[in-house]
Amino acid sequence: MSAFGFPGGGAPTPPQGSFWDMTPEQQGMYSANLIMGTMQSCPGKSVMAGVTGFGLGGVFGLFMASMAYDAPVGMGVQTMSDLPFKQQMKIQFTDMGKRAWSSAKNFGFIGGVFSGTECCIESLRAKNDIWNGVAAGCLTGGGLAVKAGPQAALVGCAGFAAFSAAIDVYMRSDNKAPPSTDEDL
């Protein structure tokens, strides 16, 4: 793997002539190699994690906002039941949209930063082990909390590193594989 995950220093070159001079099979292989190279690069992984995190965060935020059946944040009314139904719906949907957007931005940012950091560390170390995720978790957690002070950065570093280590240990364990036959039980 080359520096920071760019495969072969850039996009693959067509085997002969232009793209349109290739056979359909060659075009398919060229396109597949281009897509795979992009998805395996650090920028590609970071963008994919950010977009996926954004989508997952939006769904999570929408779900959490729908579960908050009390008064929305910042509402000056004592109870929602005092308002007409149409006004209640308007306030609830506005609040759900704000929470979903906020959660989506946070999840997307954290996913993109963590994934990009982990990929860069893996490329620099030229190893694929648990310590890449631990270091990336520490850098991501500490970096996100650095504005709150050194203690918050240290707690963020430790928290993200521990969570990343726990997920990596679980994902690398052999316990998750189902038995191949009933006799293996």
From Swiss-Prot:
Annotated GO biological process? protein insertion into mitochondrial inner membrane
Q: Where in the cell is it found?
A: Mitochondrion inner membrane
* GO function term, MF aspect, one: mitochondrion targeting sequence binding
What coarse category fits the chief subcellular location reported for this protein?
A: mitochondrion
State the family named in the UniProt similarity comment for this chain.
Belongs to the Tim17/Tim22/Tim23 family.
Protein purpose:
Essential core component of the TIM22 complex, a complex that mediates the import and insertion of multi-pass transmembrane proteins into the mitochondrial inner membrane. In the TIM22 complex, it constitutes the voltage-activated and signal-gated channel. Forms a twin-pore translocase that uses the membrane potential as external driving force in 2 voltage-dependent steps.
Assembly and oligomerization: Component of the TIM22 complex, whose core is composed of TIM22 and TIM54, associated with the 70 kDa heterohexamer composed of TIM9 and TIM10 (or TIM8 and TIM13).
PANTHER family noted in UniProt:
MITOCHONDRIAL IMPORT INNER MEMBRANE TRANSLOCASE SUBUNIT TIM22
Name of this protein = Mitochondrial import inner membrane translocase subunit TIM22
Species annotation: Yarrowia lipolytica (strain CLIB 122 / E 150)
Q: What gene does the UniProt entry assign to this protein?
A: TIM22
